């Protein structure tokens, strides 16, 4: 996507293929080549110099030292011990000890909308069956890994599974379980250890049947030492299990990789971000365009609940449908369920995924009977009049109409902005569909505030970066933000 008015499609598992990974070539700056680049574009300039700088990946060349370090066990340590607070160092030969950094520093950890996985959460490794969508890639001639998926001075890559065995990489990090980020991961994966959040690790086993021996789950807000580099996962406010990844190198250099995220005020209170230096920010720039200024998640949820109640007052026999991806948008249908006091119907595959979260708010409110509740969750691709009409026919004895919500940032309109009451639904016969701008990515204004809060030395966009002109527009925004 460039700075035009055309929206990108999102795939059935969550996000769009956001870094141009379907293209076959890269430009001279290491970005995926885009044919839309103008022929008369200047070869030199800020963007060119910026992206050429620091792109020497000789540090990733595999050598004996790297190979040796890759087989060492991951070490986990407490930040308060490093800072002189009293706590015994964990014995790395014993089972890994988990320490909440917020508790260590005497801070109260913000609670998410839904409950985090408890210690009693069930862990399942059963597979959902074969995926209709093949997320594998050709092993015969895998494309070279783009530089912006590698971390300089480390043997690490982030969300770089479709490139096969990346030379010099001894640790593959996954920010979250959306297909455009895990593409390339299959049960046959054998290229190296995978590091991700605990919830994401359960989804890898459940949905993709990835070998558990390849997966190394990390808890949020716990510092780990991997190949001598300190790594901490931070809540990303995107989808369940999504994490920002904070890397601190031996020389003190700090990288923050956002994966996909929605910036929030709570992030600014995190001990690793508040008054801390970030040298390089790998930024989710999905909506890095001045036209995007989303209403808050809370405002959208309140709007959805109000519309639902108003609709039911007029037509009590209404079936409520919420579109969703494999994961994501849970807050929307959970808000409706709580407001109406009803359970949530989803098919068996989705129920297994939702139950794997270990969140009581969802697990206790799931129904196996579509006739027993008026709230159904369907794939986002099913939110079309024809498909909803077919769905209604199945329950025609209980319901006479359908009210559906398509919650995605791509429904955003500048004319509506934050004025949600201006939204006009699509209505045909017994079907009414509301597109609501419930985004799990940062809006332009939220990106600006986050960048101005962190004030990094360098920003590397990870989305919509396949066009040099678009990159220059984004860099122009970054320069303007950091002047203030």
Curated annotation (Swiss-Prot):
User: Record's superkingdom?
Assistant: Eukaryota
* Extent of Acidic residues compositional bias: 1-11
Membrane-crossing segments per the record: none
Keywords from the named record: DNA damage, DNA repair, Nucleus
Compositionally biased, Polar residues: which spans?
A: 109-127
Protein induction: Induced by bleomycin, methyl methane sulphonate and hydrogen peroxide, which are known to induce oxidative lesions in DNA. Also induced by bacterial flagellin, which is known to elicit plant defense responses and a rapid oxidative burst, and by xylanase.
Q: What SUPFAM superfamilies does the entry give? A: Metallo-hydrolase/oxidoreductase
* Gene3D superfamilies assigned: 3.40.50.12650, Ribonuclease Z/Hydroxyacylglutathione hydrolase-like
| Family note | Belongs to the DNA repair metallo-beta-lactamase (DRMBL) family.
* Designated name of the protein: DNA cross-link repair protein SNM1
The organism encoding this protein is Arabidopsis thaliana (Mouse-ear cress)
Gene behind this protein: SNM1
